[in-house]
Amino acid sequence: MKLKETLNLGKIAFPMRADLPNKEPQWQAAWEQAELYKKRQELNAGKPAFHLHDGPPYANGNIHVGHALNKISKDIIVRSKSMSGFQAPYVPGWDTHGLPIEQVLAKQGIKRKEMNLAEYLEMCRQYALSQVDKQRDDFKRLGVSADWENPYVTLDPQFEADQIRVFGAMAEKGYIYRGAKPVYWSWSSESALAEAEIEYHDIDSTSLYYANKVKDGKGILDTNTYIVVWTTTPFTVTASRGLTVGPDMDYLVVKPAGSDRQYVVAEGLLDSLAGKFGWESFETLASHKGADLEYIVTEHPWDTDVEELVILGDHVTLESGTGIVHTAPGFGEDDYNVGTKYKLEVAVTVDERGLMMENAGPDFHGQFYNKVTPIVIDKLGDLLLAQEVINHSYPFDWRTKKPIIWRAVPQWFASVSDFRQDILDEIEKTTFHPSWGETRLYNMIRDRGDWVISRQRAWGVPLPIFYAEDGTAIMTKEVTDHVADLFQENGSIIWWQKEAKDLLPEGFTHPGSPNGEFTKETDIMDVWFDSGSSWNGVMNARENLSYPADLYLEGSDQYRGWFNSSLITSVAVNGHAPYKAILSQGFVLDGKGEKMSKSKGNIISPNDVAKQYGADILRLWVASVDTDNDVRVSMEILGQVSETYRKIRNTLRFLIANTSDFNPATDTVAYADLGAVDKYMTIVFNQLVATITDAYERYDFMAIYKAVVNFVTVDLSAFYLDFAKDVVYIEAANSLERRRMQTVFYDILVKITKLLTPILPHTTEEIWSYLEYESEAFVQLAEMPVAETFSAQEDILEAWSAFMTLRTQAQKALEEARNAKIIGKSLEAHLTIYASEEVKTLLTALDSDIALLLIVSQLTIADLADAPADAVAFEGIAFMVEHAIGEVCERSRRIDPTTRMRSYNAFVCDHSAKIIEENFPEAVAEGFEESGK
């Protein structure tokens, strides 16, 4: 027998290398075979409910790292709730209608307008479902636990029917109407867009300063006066029908030197404009308030059939321009709102494809709208005072990445103004994480216009509206309920397969159709109405879910998207928000803080991360970042996270190895019988349990990450395990000292494995497989630990905090001795502590082997007054380091004066000799194989 065989080195079957890319799929297969999600739901039956509603990602392409952040975050929350006494099902969803899928088919050469519509829609449907399958596999690879066999998909007939019922309820309350307001119009998509489908980019535009000649000055301005206006969209001058001034702003009539014309501009902008126009000097002829100029009539710059009226508007500012805004009600929301008050014509001179229409005039007809600036300049002639290129923020279609325009076209709207205050009241009742989300959503709802819900596309849910012979729109409850039932049975495809009369209830009549003839709407609903109705199609429809949901969790862009649309529909129909709380997260940027894009080559694919590092590394990254703000990720950052993971894994590996002979049923030592330092570690660990429990409640994953890393690296590795290994290795296998520490080891191991399961489910499942005494087959079926408190806990923590200060001081003294070549490693030291009475009292109270804790072979405690001059001194304490006396025990590696060669060929100290002689009589009788001496 070899001497080292008398040590309790533990069985280390748990591998140091995680090999996550290969092992994770094996665990996922095991979970699926064991129907783990289903079993967890069965365990939680009857418990309090926690229902997170999954915002549906768009079904197109593999998932990106933003999807991973979102889904992993949701999984962490739902797993933690499921293990903490809540019935917490997770139903994933997908958004499957809309333009992107039409664009994919177009790129494949499929031409919608040249084929049967039903056939085309079926192709869209099949493509969407294929993308659902692709993304489902991607999410499952990340270890996300969900009801994958029963997701909600917005193209499902049941979902479409429930969406129609939401529309019908809003229509019944009068919230759906048709109007010709200006809307965001995408010429590249040939469709209206909602605010949530807009993104802004900085672009260069040519802006023009020009003048309208006064035609009727109403006794205030004479006819040789010109009103100066500014535009950044020259094409809209073709539809200009008014000039808007600020009612309380001051305007001057000035006559430039050498000119026979006089001009009206805002007083606050005159100096800057004079420079732009080359007016070296000018004479001020008069001053007027904007309100005085109301109803003055001017000539259109070139269209002699058009007059432009001076009107008043509160949206006019002195930030730029001339203080006078040319007003084209067909091309702007403010223009429309102020223009309708004065009954200005709502002229639209651009068609759905962005081409100038015939009513723009023969010089413009057929030209692309943003190519007509040279024509406008030519038509203005000497009315043009200046032109300049400006850089400004401009709206783009978020899908096609092309600029859009405001354009008045007949559309269907959902009113927000009718119940805006009700929505705002509901926002104030909602909990927000982070708290600033409340202000953000509140302001968006407060300031938004009515919602354009119609789209001029094919792949989507039809608007269930019929038209009588006289043009009356029909959307009564009887009709929408019937359409909903048809969709539930057949899917929305039936809308395109049947005539209007066959979609109406049997025997339906209407006074507007004396001949019984009806037509149907051909527009579809905005896809935000699809997902915005999910509270009804999912949370309100499924027995195992509830409405309102406990939590909606999405990226911060969803304040104007899903959070917004869901809130509007829910309050409209039921008078309350669809959620009790909202958690929003920042965007994922690359390692340099830049937006990810294919062109930059900085995209991080979750699938690539899973192949290189493993999903648990990506999950740990999610827990490590502050998602209240934008977060960064790169392969280098993930490499750093992997290093942290390795430290956690290897620390837990040590605990597994050193509890391999520990049976918790027979070997556990009661808290009252633990050693003082073991009690301290138990208290510290339970504080960690409390911290993690609270952080899960607050959805603060980063707090969990920081607390776990600090505990593992500082409290365990750098302190407790640093000296505890000398006990568990060296003491007799069944000794009280060893079982005390193993009790703490095992308690930490089991509980931290449970606590980390929501974040690192694959790793903790592997650890759990080594814990043979735990009854649950999978850690995911276990319950979260509950933090305990202990008698005199605060006093114990205070005493050990003081010791930690002493320990740091002692380590400094030992380091100086190392540098002076007095010792090599700390076990070569004889440390003398010269202590004040206060420190002596502390050391006595600790009731511990201080030499063991400081990892020195010999320790002496003396009076502070006796400290030599060359001692390393601190307030109330000093240290002296000398080389320990004696020889190194081959078994404990400590220097001990009792170390000598024993008759059984072992060069050991008396303490090791006693352990050997009591526990290994055969080795004593036969002698050990070899000795270093």
From Swiss-Prot:
EC number per UniProt: 6.1.1.5
Q: Which InterPro entries match?
A: aa-tRNA-synth_I_CS (IPR001412), aa-tRNA-synth_Ia (IPR002300), Anticodon_Ile_BEm (IPR033708), Ile-tRNA-ligase (IPR002301), Ile-tRNA-ligase_type1 (IPR023585), Ile-tRNA_ligase (IPR050081), M/V/L/I-tRNA-synth_anticd-bd (IPR013155), Rossmann-like_a/b/a_fold (IPR014729)
In chain numbering, motif 'KMSKS' region lies across 595-599
Chief localization: cytoplasm
Q: Which GO terms describe its cellular component?
A: cytosol
* Keyword list, A-Z: Aminoacyl-tRNA synthetase, ATP-binding, Cytoplasm, Ligase, Nucleotide-binding, Protein biosynthesis
Chain span(s) of sequence motif 'HIGH' region = 57-67
Class of the enzyme per the UniProt entry, highest EC level:
ligase
Q: Which reaction does it catalyse?
A: tRNA(Ile) + L-isoleucine + ATP = L-isoleucyl-tRNA(Ile) + AMP + diphosphate
- Residues involved in ATP binding: K598
Q: What GO molecular function annotation could you give as one example from this UniProt entry?
A: aminoacyl-tRNA deacylase activity
Q: Alphabetically, which GO biological process terms does the record hold?
A: isoleucyl-tRNA aminoacylation
Q: Where does L-isoleucyl-5'-AMP bind?
A: E554
Cell location: Cytoplasm
Name the HAMAP family for this protein.
Ile_tRNA_synth_type1 (MF_02002)
Describe the task this protein carries out: Catalyzes the attachment of isoleucine to tRNA(Ile). As IleRS can inadvertently accommodate and process structurally similar amino acids such as valine, to avoid such errors it has two additional distinct tRNA(Ile)-dependent editing activities. One activity is designated as 'pretransfer' editing and involves the hydrolysis of activated Val-AMP. The other activity is designated 'posttransfer' editing and involves deacylation of mischarged Val-tRNA(Ile).
Q: Family, per the entry?
A: Belongs to the class-I aminoacyl-tRNA synthetase family. IleS type 1 subfamily.
Show the NCBIfam families listed in the entry: ileS
Domain note: IleRS has two distinct active sites: one for aminoacylation and one for editing. The misactivated valine is translocated from the active site to the editing site, which sterically excludes the correctly activated isoleucine. The single editing site contains two valyl binding pockets, one specific for each substrate (Val-AMP or Val-tRNA(Ile)).
How the protein assembles, per its UniProt entry?
Monomer.
Q: What's the protein called, per UniProt?
A: Isoleucine--tRNA ligase
| Organism of derivation | Streptococcus pyogenes serotype M6 (strain ATCC BAA-946 / MGAS10394)
